[in-house]
Amino acid sequence: MATKNNPIASPEMMNAIRNDASDAYKAAVPLATASNLADVGNPILAYDAMANEFLSALVNKIVATILYRKMWNNPLSMLRKNAEPLGVDVEEAHVNPATAQAYDGTETGMAAVLKMTKPDVAAAWYRLNRQDKYPVTINNEQLTNAFVSWNALENLIQGIVDSLYNANTIDEFKYTKQLVVDAITDGKLKTVTAVMPNNEATGKQFQVQLRNMSMLFTFPSSTYNNYKLMGGTGNDRVTWSPIEDQLIIIRADVAANIGVEVLSAAFNLSYSDYLARQIIVDDLGADGKTLAVLADTKTFQIREKLRRFTTFYNGSAMNWNYWLHAWDTFSLSPFHNCVALRTA
């Protein structure tokens, strides 16, 4: 998706850093105007302590606060659940509907009042499985050149965003898609055969199949979740997904061939309501067979564990090393409906 292009580097940004800086920084660095960037930069470049304070504020506060202007928007980010800052495992429990028993008014039936009937419970555990770090180095020459003009300072900021934040966001997108691809490859995700919609007839056929699957999701069933495929033991798990809990991840070329109006009609939703449940992606695997994935929103168990900046100044080389650490859990739930539509 496109990103906003308003510049970040500005006198307002420099003064925001100054406002939160130490007294020594404020005494040495003048207020910024549109025409005095060099005067602002001179004391920052002259003293390591000033440079450290400036870069720390730039990376940790300014860029982190307003980086959305420069960020690529991950369309799959809506699948993320609440952060889990404690522990490395997350448990999800599923309780099957109780089994009906015939009424028995005899003494035998009355005796059963003290009998224990345990609920049919199954549990899945999701473990922390991503611990990435993204490095960027800013050397003295880069910092010096950044104070030549506002455009040069903007380029420095963009480099930080690209190296740290955008790299992380792009990887989050790839990891989420890979959940689906790996599950299909490993035989852990149910699939149905669908036709590639490349004309009016096949488009209608795809729409009917998608609508039928969506309606079937709303009924209690064990047919469309992946509990047994993912190694679950014991009884099948009965679940259902109301329309408002469903989403579709669909390839861009497939969505373009059908059109949003047709797809929204498949779900019996308005244009705007359907768009809120549609996620368009570039591909769903190298084999090119997966056209779309219809899923309950709870299928995707993606949780942020940690986002942290660390820094190190190398006085010998006169450069600053920054790392963005990103720890997450990426998993698919076995308990909720999820089916991939694939060509033969």
Please provide the spans of the model-predicted regions.
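Assembly/oligomerization interface modules of large self-assembling protein complexes
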Residues: A51-V136
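Long, contiguous amphipathic alpha-helices that act as assembly "spine/axial" helices in icosahedral shell
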Residues: P119-L189, Y322-L324
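Extended, compositionally biased alpha-helical segments that mediate assembly or anchoring
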Residues: M1-T65, R69, N73, L263-A344
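Short glycine-rich, low-complexity/disordered patches
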Residues: M71-L79, I170-T176, V180-D186, Y224-M230
